[in-house]
Amino acid sequence: MHKLIIHGGTPLKGIINISGAKNAVLPIMAASILTDKLHITNVPKLTDVSTMKDLLRSHGADIEIIEHQDEFELIIDTKNINNFTADYEIVRKMRASIWVLGPLLTKYGKAKVSLPGGCAIGARQVDLHIAVLKAMGAEIEIEDGYINASSKGRLKGTHFVFDKVSVGATINAILAAVLAEGETMLFNCGREPEIVDLCNCLITMGADIAGIGTSEITIKGKDSLNKASYKVLSDRIEAGTYMFAAAITKGDVKICRIDYHIVENIALKLIETGIKVVPINNGVQVTYEGKLNSVDLETNPYPGFATDLQAQFMSLMTLSSGVSMITENIFENRFMHVPELCRMGADIVVRGNKAVVRGVEMLKGAEVMASDLRASVSLILAGLSTNSKTVLHRIYHLDRGFQDLEKKLSNCGADIKRV
């Protein structure tokens, strides 16, 4: 099994280009089921993308892959979909597999999807997905670990209020509603840029969607959607990760191919800590200027601070000048990186959904183990900050969400290699 060896202590300096957003491309790929052909560009080279390709092919899709140096193009032809079951062997690898449920059900009137897998960071139940589809007229039962869904005729437009903000359920609801009969109004929706990107892609395909980027989305169902081409937006989580990498290594990095407005809340939090962050053409520049203040943080649905960046921010705060309180409001089990950071000398105490981080002068290298995607990269950031050697095990998580991570860091001076 591969591992990463990191020799820290070098400030990162240079340019990092951001890849396409994983959390946007996966639902957009699922949306291809709604039409006959979808051409997607700026597709990141990630194992989760490969898993979604395998899933779509298992349903009968034909996928042409055009490889470029930094991205894929995908041409997905779904006119011959003939299998409506998403098997456990594929779905267990990635929770995003559940996003084929809405498209299959709304277009073909039936779907059977295994209960999903992915990172072990909380329950992330499918109750809201099922509830909104039932509100559209679907008949759904869970049997033998599968969601069995069917509808008599087309799904029907509905008014639905999500009990809590759910990105995944918002996406499935939108994917189902675009071909439902009549008007669907969704309340308390996720507002994430990746949801906006999905909606913009669906509009390119001919969907009628209003309220994009707000908590209230209105969709007027169409009889069919068109072929289309669409470029996926860049990954704000990847961008934020490298912004924190620049800060924790006392570096100076230009992070390019990202719109500043979707990383502005990250930039503002870094500025609070004393890091210099300025917008530049096609990106943002992050520069350490000699101090790192302790700052409290709460994760919340967008436009709040992303839970997917909480672990990276915590790594940064382990070296801050005081005490910070980090509150995790999204997932109940997202502090699994804490014991590993403590192995490296961090002073962190977890109390329920809160972590108290007391800054130390320096972390030290150690052998550590990744528990999930975002935790793994937080340990890399910690390793880069030390003046010694860190060995990170179970790095297969990284390839699910970060394209060319070692290359991008090495190009900025990091000593990091996979063995």
From Swiss-Prot:
Its EC number is 2.5.1.7. The lineage of its organism: Bacteria, Pseudomonadati, Pseudomonadota, Alphaproteobacteria, Rickettsiales. UDP-N-acetyl-alpha-D-glucosamine binds at residues 95, 164-167, 308, 330. This is UDP-N-acetylglucosamine 1-carboxyvinyltransferase. Transmembrane segments: none annotated. It comes from Rickettsia conorii (strain ATCC VR-613 / Malish 7). Pfam families: EPSP_synthase. It catalyses: phosphoenolpyruvate + UDP-N-acetyl-alpha-D-glucosamine = UDP-N-acetyl-3-O-(1-carboxyvinyl)-alpha-D-glucosamine + phosphate. Keywords: Cell cycle, Cell division, Cell shape, Cell wall biogenesis/degradation, Cytoplasm, Peptidoglycan synthesis, Pyruvate, Transferase. It comes from the Bacteria. SUPFAM superfamilies: EPT/RTPC-like (SSF55205). The keyword Cell division applies. One of its GO terms (biological process) is peptidoglycan biosynthetic process. Belongs to the EPSP synthase family. MurA subfamily. HAMAP family: MurA (MF_00111). The modification 2-(S-cysteinyl)pyruvic acid O-phosphothioketal is found at residue 119. Pathway: Cell wall biogenesis; peptidoglycan biosynthesis. It is found in: Cytoplasm. GO terms for molecular function: UDP-N-acetylglucosamine 1-carboxyvinyltransferase activity. Phosphoenolpyruvate binds at residues 22-23. The keyword Disulfide bond does not apply. GO terms for cellular component: cytoplasm. The active site is at residue 119. Cell wall formation. Adds enolpyruvyl to UDP-N-acetylglucosamine.
